[in-house]
Amino acid sequence: MVFCLSSEEPRRPLRSDMVHFQASEVQQLLHNKFVVILGDSIQRAVYKDLVLLLQKDSLLTAAQLKAKGELSFEQDQLVAGGQLGELHNGTQYREVRQFCSGSGHHLVRFYFLTRVYSEYLEDVLEELTYGPAPDLVIINSCLWDLSRYGRCSMESYRENLERVFVRMDQVLPDSCLLVWNMAMPLGERITGGFLLPELQPLAGSLRRDVVEGNFYSATLAGDHCFDVLDLHFHFRHAVQHRHRDGVHWDQHAHRHLSHLLLTHVADAWGVELPKRGYPPDPWIEDWAEMNHPFQGSHRQTPDFGEHLALLPPPPSSLPPPMPFPYPLPQPSPPPLFPPLPQDTPFFPGQPFPPHEFFNYNPVEDFSMPPHLGCGPGVNFVPGPLPPPIPGPNPHGQHWGPVVHRGMPRYVPNSPYHVRRMGGPCRQRLRHSERLIHTYKLDRRPPAHSGTWPG
């Protein structure tokens, strides 16, 4: 978004508590967490940088950023779509990836989306209903929505945004934190693969459409009490880190994005972070602090009993909801495969319950050896936390951007237990309760074919 200041005072950097995370700290923050990332190729790069940062303190290579649908990336695996199917730039492209750490205490999954709400997204939500409940969902969809679905794409995008937030509110458990990543700024010349040659005349207006779409998505996410990370704001001065295609970004930008995202998540979970002094980022300038419609935040306490900290703490109005174009699933009996005992960690080699609706067929009966991953049919269970990261005592200030949130800061039992739309927030069912209310779709193509790794 663009903010105009009436004052002639020079701009000054905005102080924030953004932390430059090390791999060991990311491992602690996401210990026993299931992270789901949904979106386009930029969100795939978000997934890749997070997977890499969970393992080592290094940056993605240009080849890794450019790769699409590869069979394996940094110990992850391609579950469906990509090279297992057909590589193309159509709206039916699918790619599902998953990373499970060797310890079994970190699970990250990625679904490629070409539209924010669709029949395919309903299949993804169905899959998440049967499997372990996500602890963190990171989602964005904008560029495809505004460029590949006809003349009324903005109107359709607004309707689909409302639908997706309603469905996320219905499906995700109370313990899940959802972060909506706003679309990053585009270049003046756009040659990204999502924009077909015959659609190049749209490139000029697409930059303005993204700003408008960001406004609608942030407003709706905030009204549904979901978090918003304004990447358009944060990266508007970082043009030297944007690729020549006008859409994608280099490895330095994506590592900065990961730091922003993880700082946001840690703050929402109430996790104490290591405080190290950093100089101002030379490629990020922020406006002076001002009122913003999406400022404020809410916290979510960790999903297990012991206090989670990377270091010891220091002493001291919208339109009514749109109708759904796809029939919503009806309740059905609980799944035939009950969850494993609650003291079982998420280790490789455990099978994922087969679903009779896995009939979509890019590749029949796909499976991977057990040592390559872990089956998501097991609930995450708290395990002992790794020891705190040794480091210097907190000192100094950090420089970084503002995180825009939808709700004022306070400490409830869950991140979304707030008043919304003039009434009390409806309590979402937790995963154990939702097992009674699971549903099956009527012969709808699943989010992926075959079996989950393991």
UniProtKB/Swiss-Prot annotation:
Domain of life the protein comes from: Eukaryota
CDD domains, per the entry: SGNH_hydrolase_like_5
Record family assignment: Belongs to the PC-esterase family.
PANTHER family (alphabetical): PC-ESTERASE DOMAIN-CONTAINING PROTEIN 1A, SARCOMA ANTIGEN NY-SAR-23
Name of protein: PC-esterase domain-containing protein 1A
Native organism: Homo sapiens (Human)
